[in-house]
């Protein structure tokens, strides 16, 4: 993306979205709005709290969009309390077949597509040129709506559905988690503010797939955040 654009960022307070917000500022973009979605996810309480703190730290406008009807999609363990989120030994982040199986458990129908379209509507209304989500190459292998191809196709769709032809860009879509951590470290991201866990709690659980990927990424980058994990 060219520098000095007005942008809307999607901010879940996870590793990827937080680093993208910091990188957008580094590229001299004006973040006119940071959007966080409450769609009934298990980690909603912590995500909303952490996102607000990150936005405050960056000095950018922040808005929470309520999407209660996502609960109608009752097959995802991220939304349904009586369905177990895969954790611990049930998660093998280096096993592609196993990762595809666990991905099905936490998949929410068209979640990222809906998020991008809502963000694009805000972008057009606020005179912004682009929407910046937080994606990564590691999870794109099992979640196609994290891929660069998805970003490209979303931009093509928005050319027709927004009068100012809002684009979708992401600074981390080509990177794996360890490289995103290194990028964030260079940007001086305050890691204690992020929330990369599938659950709410006092600390990151350390056992869900998102935590296991984050744990490995921080270790690979030689950054000690053990105190932020429950286990």
Swiss-Prot record:
InterPro entries, A to Z: QueC, Rossmann-like_a/b/a_fold
GO molecular function, a single term: ligase activity, forming carbon-nitrogen bonds
Reactions performed catalytically: 7-carboxy-7-deazaguanine + NH4(+) + ATP = 7-cyano-7-deazaguanine + ADP + phosphate + H2O + H(+)
Superkingdom per UniProt: Bacteria
EC number(s) given by UniProt: 6.3.4.20
Keyword list, A-Z: ATP-binding, Ligase, Metal-binding, Nucleotide-binding, Queuosine biosynthesis, Zinc
Binding positions for ATP per the UniProt entry: 11-21
Pathway: Purine metabolism; 7-cyano-7-deazaguanine biosynthesis
UniProt keyword annotation of Ribosomal protein present: no
Pfam families: QueC (PF06508)
Cofactor: Zn(2+)
Entry's cofactor comment: Binds 1 zinc ion per subunit.
Membrane-spanning intervals of the chain: none
Residues bound to Zn(2+): 197, 205, 208, 211
The keyword Magnesium appears for this protein: no
One GO process term, biological-process aspect: queuosine biosynthetic process
Biological role: Catalyzes the ATP-dependent conversion of 7-carboxy-7-deazaguanine (CDG) to 7-cyano-7-deazaguanine (preQ(0)).
HAMAP family: QueC (MF_01633)
Sequence similarity: Belongs to the QueC family.
Protein name: 7-cyano-7-deazaguanine synthase
Gene label: queC
